[in-house]
Regions:
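Extracytoplasmic Ser/Thr/Pro-rich, glycosylation-prone low-complexity segments
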Residues: 1-167
Length: 167
């Protein structure tokens, strides 16, 4: 079993960048997205996702990233029905106002973009979840993706179980 990558700097060791203190591209701390420029890791052209390159990725507090636009929906849907490019390690109704935080780290030397949802609480219910997604540059804007689940205590944040996958 893989363990979450730490030692990335910042207040908790999972990255210098903190969701709750960042400028939101859409939504709020409960159902919001921030835009992260990924060119320091993937080069000036950006990251290639199924033939389209993006210089920025939207990190959503509800456990997913999107490429073409931010998402503010709190209810997860079947990933194949989402309709926009996305990768979801754990798309559910996360509410960091109730606990936890989201960190991210861009490491050009290692060629990684690491996003950590640390001790995040559900909108309704109890418990916390910790999980991580790492995008690794494999050259020419291409990448590999790794999901790491540390401690999952809940699967249903409000309506519907968590969704995992990509589209």
């Amino acid at each position: 079993m893989a363990t979450m990558v730490s030692g990335l700097g910042g207040p908790a060791g999972y990255g210098e960048n903190v969701f709750s203190t960042s400028t939101l591209a859409a939504g709020n701390l409960d159902d919001g997205s921030i835009l992260v420029d990924v060119t320091s890791v993937f080069g000036g052209a950006g990251i290639n996702f199924f033939g389209t390159t993006y210089t920025g990725i939207y990190v959503n507090n509800n456990g997913l990233i999107t490429f073409s636009s931010p998402v503010t929906a709190y209810t997860p849907i079947a990933i194949e029905g989402y309709g926009s490019p996305a990768i979801a390690p754990f798309w559910s109704d996360v509410d960091i106002n109730k606990g936890g935080e989201i960190y991210w780290d861009l490491d050009p030397t290692a060629g990684t973009f690491t996003i950590t949802w640390l001790n995040v609480a559900p909108y309704t219910g109890t418990g916390t979840n910790s999980f991580q997604m790492i995008l690794r540059d494999t050259g020419s804007g291409d990448f590999s993706v790794e999901f790491i689940y540390d401690d999952i205590q809940w699967t249903n944040g409000y309506r519907g179980d968590a969704t995992v996958g990509f589209t």
